[in-house]
A protein has these predicted regions:
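Cleavable N-terminal export/targeting peptides
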Residues: 1-38, 277-280
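Short glycine/proline- and aromatic-enriched beta-strand/turn motifs that initiate or cap beta-hairpins
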Residues: 22-84, 121, 273-275
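Intrinsically disordered, low-complexity linker/tail regions enriched in polar/charged residues
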Residues: 23-26, 31, 145, 181-183, ...
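Predominantly the C-terminal beta-signal and adjacent terminal strand-loop region
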Residues: 26, 37-44, 227-280
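Outer-membrane pore/translocation modules
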Residues: 49-57, 84-206, 214-216, 223, ...
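Conserved aromatic-histidine-acidic binding/catalytic patches
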Residues: 63-66, 70, 109, 151, ...
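Membrane-embedded beta-strand positions in outer-membrane beta-barrel channels/transporters
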Residues: 71, 75-77, 118-120, 160, ...
Length: 280
């Protein structure tokens, strides 16, 4: 009798132990889950795309196209992460570089009209709440100039604070505010045209084929004066980060040389996007 009772107890313990082990494995603390999310993000390549990279050409909207109002705009942008999320408050450090070119391909000799250089360094923190990645906050120091001298020189340095909110897996809202710390001699009024802050969103279709961006850049002053950028892209194939893109720009400050000139441009071409949401 005792022997049979011990056999039953042994069997019950054997059944219960795996279940107890499963409970211990599943019940992880909030901190452990947050750490695992950071570890997954830190495991991604150190070198990656930053802002959108594109090659688009087009002309003025609402006017007669000519060699003087038609052009090609090129942007390349990348980042190099310097650390993992091991700095205070789980932040990480990275370098970034963006270059923009305006190319007058419809004129004789095909001259480049302007080249804008935008290097910088940033300190970012992924924001994790309720066991989910919900956003990112970044403090950065940026330089932007066009590499020219004399009266054609345009440059400024600024401290920027940026934030991203991942509202849904396919929707991100973003905002960025900057404080200039050094102006170039010939562009001291650049805030009146290139703005003081921006806000926008990026939406991706459920089938990951379409991407829509809209950014509003507020120019200095109390009036409702914005520069507007809208981009619509269609993925070339399912496994590619290349898109066919339509881009619309309306306002001032599209590039540094002619930052005081109003532009309304529609362009079409190739877009190359980061794996996740783009930076702005």
């Amino acid at each position: 009798m005792i022997r049979h009772l011990l056999s039953v107890i042994t069997l019950l313990v054997g059944i219960a132990m795996p279940a107890m082990g499963q409970i211990v494995t599943i019940e992880r603390s909030t901190q452990e889950i947050a750490d695992s999310i950071r570890a997954e993000l830190d495991s991604r390549p150190y070198f990656s795309l930053y802002k959108d990279t594109y090659f688009v050409g087009g002309t003025v909207l609402g006017g007669k196209p000519s060699e003087y109002n038609s052009d090609v705009k090129i942007q390349i942008s990348f980042q190099q992460r310097l650390t993992k999320s091991v700095l205070p408050f789980h932040t990480y450090l990275y370098l970034f570089y963006t270059q923009k070119a305006i190319w007058h391909v419809f004129r004789n000799s095909l001259p480049f009209h302007d080249l804008n250089f935008n290097p910088g360094i940033g300190l970012s923190k992924h924001i994790i709440m309720k066991n989910k990645l919900v956003g990112k906050a970044t403090l950065m120091v940026e330089h932007e100039s066009n590499g020219k001298d004399g009266t054609k020189s345009r440059s400024w340095n600024k401290i920027s604070l940026a934030a991203e909110a991942y509202i849904a897996p396919q929707l991100m809202a973003h905002a960025k505010y900057w404080i200039p710390i050094v102006y170039g001699k010939y562009n001291k009024d650049i805030l009146d045209y290139s703005g003081i802050y921006q806000a926008g969103f990026q939406a991706i279709s459920n089938d990951n084929k379409w991407v829509l961006d809209m950014t509003l850049i507020k120019r200095r002053g109390w009036n409702l004066n914005f520069n507007t950028v809208v981009q619509l892209g269609y993925r070339i194939n399912h496994n590619s980060n290349q898109f066919i893109m339509l881009q619309y720009y309306n306002g001032y400050g599209e590039y540094m040389m002619d930052y005081k000139q109003y532009h309304s441009r529609i362009r079409f071409g190739l877009l190359i996007r980061p794996r996740f949401f783009s930076d702005f």
